[in-house]
UniProtKB/Swiss-Prot annotation:
This is dCTP deaminase. It comes from Sphingopyxis alaskensis (strain DSM 13593 / LMG 18877 / RB2256). Catalyzes the deamination of dCTP to dUTP. GO terms for biological process: dUMP biosynthetic process; dUTP biosynthetic process. Pathway: Pyrimidine metabolism; dUMP biosynthesis; dUMP from dCTP (dUTP route): step 1/2. InterPro entries: dCTP_deaminase, dUTPase-like_sf, dUTPase_trimeric. PANTHER family: DCTP DEAMINASE. It catalyses: dCTP + H2O + H(+) = dUTP + NH4(+). Gene3D superfamilies: 2.70.40.10. Homotrimer. Its EC number is 3.5.4.13.
Amino acid sequence: MAILSDRWIREAARTQGMIEPFVEAQRRDGCISYGLSSYGYDARVAPEFKIFTNVDSTIVDPKDFDPKNFVDRETDVCIIPPNSFALARTVEYFRIPRDVLVICLGKSTYARCGIIVNVTPLEPGWEGHVTLEFSNTTPLPARIYANEGACQFLFLQGNEPCETSYADRAGKYMGQKGVTLPKL
């Protein structure tokens, strides 16, 4: 697998709509950086958040997830409570080519503050807004800034197109829009 360059990412965004909206140059003045980088794309977090709450003392169960475990917030600055968790989504909508796998890494600006972002790989043929998982590992409240960089996506090209893509097997998160909760 080869990691794909800024030239390839730009061309795929222009000709295949791989990333929409697409920011051609990295923006970093007065904000957490986002946009095209040398070998990746720094995506922004949208102002739509679901913050874990324990008001009803429920149990988190991925097979029977209760949406009441979250408080919804639309805001430019999301405050995640100490040792807590929030879901969000990217501003960008992604369409992944059949011969590409995308992995995500957190931004060092957030990681150095104890805020970890997690995203599972974007599989060949998948498309949608990416649901972002933010963990505040600190004993203090933490801020996440909407419309600024949240994570970096790295694009890996396989040696040939896959036999069965995410779209072919009708994956459960195909075409997701907004913050998407766990599905079984």
